[in-house]
């Protein structure tokens, strides 16, 4: 039986064809038996990326039924949205092996008969792990201590202890880039010994004037209460006995679906939504309604010394306002895995602050996730191209 015919430079196969782009890394767990079994029914077309022009020519001359996106695609060829007008009529689905899809217009795809699928709620555990790490860092100032221990005091534990109860700063030079930055002073450098007073640590357990405390028994406001937000709430409640409050754009979650008590807030313009939180965690997508949710007005309603974690999207925070709030102490510290302008250059003022834990968008970046996202994307492929369904996790 003939299953493919070569015409010019184009090979037409009888199987549904799933485009999988790569250049220097292969992001699909193709060693899995599930992949190999499904490869008997569909063709996983490995496309080696080169230039944007070459990719456009490829789209114009090849039949593609599915497009399995990879992170490397963004690095090499840019946003896939810029190629929508070149997508062949045969394209039936865009397969996104992660959660966030705000980089592409799902409604526009649907108007062209293209389904947009992601991996549903299956990244929640790994993003939650990072959110908890960032929350701990915010309360315990672990990023400051690590930097201080490794690069300032060169492993001298006793010298590190001299930062406790400090409330003044000095300008130091970043050992990596040679840039100046503000950094807490050691207490033995703040004043001459004869002028120093005995410090009551129970009242002033601070570094740089900012309190170090346990996350136990605190109140958290979670903005965005889908699968990730709910999982974060569950873990913070179980591990730290935190009181959970949340905002969800589509309304409250049924209490029977949660294994903990959580207070719902319906209005972000109500000061009562913000006033009790010791910690705010953002797990929101990037939309017009979530843009700059953390702003001057919302922070004014917060407690002094509130702490902020963002594992959603960088567009949700007005970064200039956040910097001002960190400087004034309105925000004690923050943990950020996402930023504005990630495609170009993240705001350097944030990266140089001692009270910011900054990570390069690694919410679900673990080896386990490569396996998991492959298996779930295969479920979408199986449902659409073998079983004739619409896809397991459809977004549009």
Swiss-Prot record:
Induction (UniProt): Glucose-repressed.
Binding-site list for NAD(+): 227-228, 311-313, 337, 361-364
UniProt KW DNA-binding keyword: no
Molecular-function GO term, any one: glyoxylate reductase (NADPH) activity
Keywords attached to this entry: NAD, Oxidoreductase
Transmembrane segments: none
Keyword Oxidoreductase among UniProt keywords: yes
Main enzyme class: oxidoreductase
EC number of this enzyme: 1.-.-.-
Active site, per annotation: 313, 342, 361 (proton donor)
Pfam families documented for this protein: 2-Hacid_dh_C (PF02826)
Purpose: Putative 2-hydroxyacid dehydrogenase.
Family: Belongs to the D-isomer specific 2-hydroxyacid dehydrogenase family.
Entry protein name: Putative 2-hydroxyacid dehydrogenase YPL113C
